């Protein structure tokens, strides 16, 4: 029988760009992929959507699995290029997440995944189409910094003004 529903299997995933401010620079959390395809490449944290969860619940699950505290996040874009994944049809929704460096505690040893913070001006070649997605996330972050008070989320209440100036210079070149 088959039918249209069986022919069009589609997977949804959330990809989370988690940013923080550290030593006057904006950093992005990436994780190293342990399996093919793109084994050894850095990628954005993400998970496939479960049938019984919303995208927002999925993002919260990703953040929780990383051992991070609850944080601000917002939906940025949806990527539906048919070549996003080689063997499956996957639609990815990207999220911009911000966390204050003082509240960070990565449970890396529990997750058994290699993670690292990268300066947004020094992002390596990433797996899949994640460089495109990261570019969109950084562009959105820059717009938010210019047009809102979103940077307050990245700093503890006792941050120094020169550090804020360094962040603006780093992000806005």
What spans do the regions from the language model cover?
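Conserved helix-adjacent loop modules within structured domains
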Residues: 147-158, 171
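Short helix-coil junctions and helix-kink-helix linkers
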Residues: 166-173
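A eukaryotic nuclear recognition-module signature that targets compact all-alpha binding cores
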Residues: 37-42, 138-150, 161
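Active-site segment of metal-dependent pyrophosphate-handling enzymes
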Residues: 6, 10-14, 27, 56-60, ...
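Short, compositionally biased serine/threonine- and acidic-rich segments at solvent-exposed termini, linkers
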Residues: 46-47
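N-terminal strand-loop-strand
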Residues: 5-42
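NUDIX/MutT-family hydrolases
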Residues: 96, 106-141, 154-165
């Amino acid at each position: 029988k088959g039918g249209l529903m069986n022919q069009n299997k589609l997977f949804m995933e959330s990809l989370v760009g988690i940013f923080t401010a550290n030593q006057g620079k904006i950093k992005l959390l990436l994780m190293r992929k342990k399996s093919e395809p793109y084994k050894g490449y850095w990628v954005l944290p993400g998970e496939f959507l479960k049938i019984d969860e919303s995208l927002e619940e999925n993002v919260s699950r990703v953040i929780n699995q990383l051992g991070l505290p609850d944080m601000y996040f917002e939906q940025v874009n949806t990527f539906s290029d048919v070549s996003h994944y080689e063997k499956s049809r996957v639609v990815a929704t990207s999220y911009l997440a911000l966390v204050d460096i003082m509240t960070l505690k990565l449970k890396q040893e529990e997750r058994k995944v290699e993670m690292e913070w990268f300066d947004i001006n020094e992002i390596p070649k990433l797996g899949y189409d994640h460089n495109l997605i990261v570019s969109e996330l950084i562009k959105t972050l820059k717009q938010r910094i210019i047009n809102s008070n979103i940077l307050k989320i990245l700093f503890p209440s006792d941050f120094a003004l020169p550090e804020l100036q360094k962040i603006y210079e780093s992000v806005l070149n």
